[in-house]
Amino acid sequence: MMRSWFPVALVLAVAGSAAAQDAPGAKLYRIVDGKADAKTYNGYRRFHAGCNHCHGQDGLGSTFGPSLVDRLPDLDAFRRIVRNGTGSGTSVMKGFADDPNVAPYIDDIFAYLQARADGALGRGRPERVD
């Protein structure tokens, strides 16, 4: 009898975990003694492989894109902007929905920027939690 409930419990646990990540103010990162978890570390790598060209080193902004450390949108808005792009006036950001180096890793990039915005992670390449 217990075996028939296991798949249901597993689905509920995964759904609950995803819902917790999407809850307003939920922390997607885990920093231990200044070291980043795998998701946050991967977000650092992905951010610095492309996003930093406009948003500056460590997400601090540049003349091309705003700081994402000083003013990080909520997760839903971040996903929407990264996928679809945004623009107003002379400032335009293309969408990355079809970019295989960005689209699958939007939440990882957000986790890194959230850790930076919260002051939980300093500048530069983070060490990884073992």
Protein language model features and the residues they cover:
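N-terminal signal peptide c-region/cleavage motif recognized by signal peptidases
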Residues: A15-S17
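Classic N-terminal secretory signal peptides
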Residues: V8-V11
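The canonical Cys-X-X-Cys-His
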Residues: H48-Q57, V82, M93, I109-L113
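Gly/Gly-Pro-rich "capping" loops immediately C-terminal to redox-active cysteine motifs
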Residues: D33, D37-T40, G56-N84, V92-G95
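Positively charged n-region of N-terminal signal peptides that target proteins for export
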Residues: M1-W5
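Flexible coil segments in periplasmic/lumen-exposed cytochrome c-class electron-transfer proteins
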Residues: Q21-D33, D37, R45, K94-D130
